[in-house]
Amino acid sequence: MKICLIDETGAGDGALSVLAARWGLEHDEDNLMALVLTPEHLELRKRDEPKLGGIFVDFVGGAMAHRRKFGGGRGEAVAKAVGIKGDYLPDVVDATAGLGRDAFVLASVGCRVRMLERNPVVAALLDDGLARGYADAEIGGWLQERLQLIHASSLTALSDITPRPQVVYLDPMFPHKQKSALVKKEMRVFQSLVGPDLDADGLLEPARLLATKRVVVKRPDYAPPLANVATPNAVVTKGHRFDIYAGTPV
């Protein structure tokens, strides 16, 4: 995949070249999307809109730390949707990992989560965030046990994953109507990079065959159900639905 690669570390150690080789990235000086290695982290920038800033994965500080410490925990909609109850903490495959936010919430309340991400740039961002998270004194121990990244296309990987998870979680890219600054910023950068999930409808059936208990699909409240398969079961929040489908028992 072609992208502009920029090293701002000043280290001169070739770390960016190693990273590019690992993820199959090719430097393109004229590309409007840039993957930038800074002294702190790896980030994605839209070069023609510098005011948007950089997008990076941070499980240790910022919004994710606040959500972990002060968020709803088991009361969060995604936790309810996957079926967390009492001692039941399902094993989850997040087949559309993105920046890993929902996967991190589930891991922070005790679920083991395998994240799938097919875009190599997004996978590199996730891997960078995980490396920093694993090294953190406060969360590193449980994060290594509970949150893993698999760089693969969900459409192919969903038929290969073993052991089977109890839950498959899907949050396909869907055009956002919201005007919130964060959504606008991230979505504009993200959609410039990966575009809409045009093949997302093809995920529902393999997800239902893989999950032993249920499939959870996050949708904006105005979006039709995935693959136009309606379900009466959903956890509804302001702005979103978590549609719930039966999996395939062992």
Swiss-Prot record:
It is an enzyme of class 2 (transferase). One of its GO terms (cellular component) is cytoplasm. InterPro entries: 16SrRNA_methylTrfase_J, SAM-dependent_MTases_sf. It catalyses: guanosine(1516) in 16S rRNA + S-adenosyl-L-methionine = N(2)-methylguanosine(1516) in 16S rRNA + S-adenosyl-L-homocysteine + H(+). Its main location: cytoplasm. It comes from the Bacteria. S-adenosyl-L-methionine binds at residues 101-102, 117-118, 153-154, 171. The keyword Transferase applies. It holds the Pfam family SAM_MT. It is found in: Cytoplasm. Keywords: Cytoplasm, Methyltransferase, rRNA processing, S-adenosyl-L-methionine, Transferase. Its EC number is 2.1.1.242. GO terms for molecular function: rRNA (guanine-N2-)-methyltransferase activity. Specifically methylates the guanosine in position 1516 of 16S rRNA. Belongs to the methyltransferase superfamily. RsmJ family. This is Ribosomal RNA small subunit methyltransferase J. It comes from Escherichia coli O1:K1 / APEC. The lineage of its organism: Bacteria, Pseudomonadati, Pseudomonadota, Gammaproteobacteria, Enterobacterales.
